Amino acid sequence: MNKLERLIVTAKPIAFFIRKSKQLIIPGFRGIPLFDVVEFFFLQVKKIGLNERAASISFNVIMAIPAACIFLFSVVPYLPVSNQFKAELLALTKDLSPNQNTYKLVESFLNDFFRKSRGGLLSFGFLLVIFYASNAMMGIIRTFEKSISDAKTYFLHKRWRAIKLTFILILLVISCVLLLIGHDALEKILKHYFHLSKSTSLYWWENTRWLLIILLIFLGNSFIYKYAPSVEKRWNLVSPGSLLATFLTLATTMGFSYWVNHFGSYNKVYGSIGTVLVIMLLINLNSLILLIGFELNVSITYLQKQVEDRKAKEKIEKKTSI
């Protein structure tokens, strides 16, 4: 610890916070004090790093997007509400886009997929499409394994897990869009039969669509944390890491959108390619957040194992002393 770090740690407000954090146990931390979790988390991040791993995940996600879209849009025409699905998916994309230019680029990309029929892919190129779409999950699984020293899994087992996770995430997106379609249909009924067009109740109802979007993000993170790591004992679906990652995703997306719209000058400097850079940067930030949530879960699990091992050792020592 250098002189500057010593001055910071010994400062009264910081010392008070450290003292309290050693006594504070947050629900979901399995009885581990906040200070111990934070300390181990930063040591783990310093040892393994985050930036390179986030870049690796980002690359795999970007490369897997076309294949995932081909599969998704090959399934959509078979849904009874395919037109509404398309409109709602574009509306969901608009809600999550940092600015109008980004949305226009994504909208053009999605419309291109919708216009071209790819029904044959469901029978002929299905396995190839799924293979490439699951590369994003494979990248996440490989990146997670760097934090788990005893993670030993065969390639085929990892690939099968990646394919299952890809299916789960695609089903989550489809389910969320279908729920949003139902939400909009119910909103029209409220407007027509109950004349709630300008009421406060309708305002709150319109904003409940954000609850579905938040639920989509949370469940996506939760399923990844539960099934992607190569561990014997799976984490719970609701974990501190998934909650933190969901909060950081929402906060980062909103903050990033505000910055792009008010302070960013990508389009002025790079022209139309600036929009692509915005999308890539947003993917990279969310990859970083995914790793932060994962490392939090790893920290809690590792410290809990240390406590359990220590208790087991003390129990054995007591028996031998008797």
Which stretches of residues belong to each language-model region?
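Membrane-embedded alpha-helices and immediately adjacent juxtamembrane helical segments
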Residues: 2-322
